[in-house]
Amino acid sequence: PALSLAAEQGHVIVPATGRALRAIPEQVMALPFLRYAITINGAKVSDARTGETLLRAELALDTCLRLMDFAGRYDAMYDCYWNDTGWVDRAFLERVRYYNADEEVVTLLRRTRAPVEDLKAFVRANGQPVQKVQLCFRDMAERETARAEITAAFPDVLVTSSFRNNLELNAVDADKGRALLALARHLGIPVEDTVAFGDSSNDLRMLRAAGTSVAMGNAAPEVRAVCDYVTDTNDRDGVAAFLRTHILHGVSL
């Protein structure tokens, strides 16, 4: 109800996610007031109603292949987004539980990844830029080692994460903040009138870019540190709580 009421008052509601458009839950995209989406960590901004792409920022093919080669030094599975679909080596998908202890993550990956026999060969044969590369780690210390090493070795790659054991690798100019600013310009909305909600490191640039930034109650400490407000958790409808208190009742931000 809070989202619907906000939309009725003229606010534009936009999901901003690391997922591709088709991987956003159906019950979200079925909301009648949703038109625009920021997806794949800002690699793409879409008009879901017309199918128009408003912004695109992708990894060069050579960079993607080098990232996959680099990932081979870690005990990690990797996949990629190309053409708005997640692709993964079949062998990795068959061992998805080895790399992911969280059953929700296992279910998500199985639902949203298309298996191929050899992902690198598949990407090379397509010969096109890739939207994102993702790594999932069994060992969290190794994840932090990989974060530092990839950041140092690939200055043209932005390294973020959205759940406990992953790293998400995008083009350095693909981030939710740049996407938010581009969409605001497209819609003629002053940036100071934008509000962003987030809980993970892939939300940081968006939260810094927005006129008002709100951390979810379950947000990582580095996310809370950059935000103007902290609301309740995802599971306790923190977005709705903030909207009711600060937006629907006309409280000045």
Positions of predicted regions on the chain:
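Short, well-ordered alpha-helical microsegments
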Residues: 21-25, 143, 177, 203-204
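Short, structured coil segments at secondary-structure junctions
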Residues: 32-33, 40-41, 49, 153-155, ...
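Conserved acidic, metal-coordinating active-site core of Asp-based
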Residues: 70, 74-77, 81-197
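Short active-site oxyanion
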Residues: 10-14, 33-35, 132, 192-193, ...
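Short, acidic loop-to-helix structural element flanking the phosphoryl-transfer center
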Residues: 1-11, 56-63, 115-120, 171-185, ...
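Alpha-helix termination/capping residues and helix-transition junctions
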Residues: 30-31, 127, 188, 224
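Mg2+-dependent phosphoryl-transfer enzymes with acidic/Ser/Thr/Gly-rich catalytic loops
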Residues: 152, 167-253
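Active-site phosphate-binding/coordination module
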Residues: 1-103
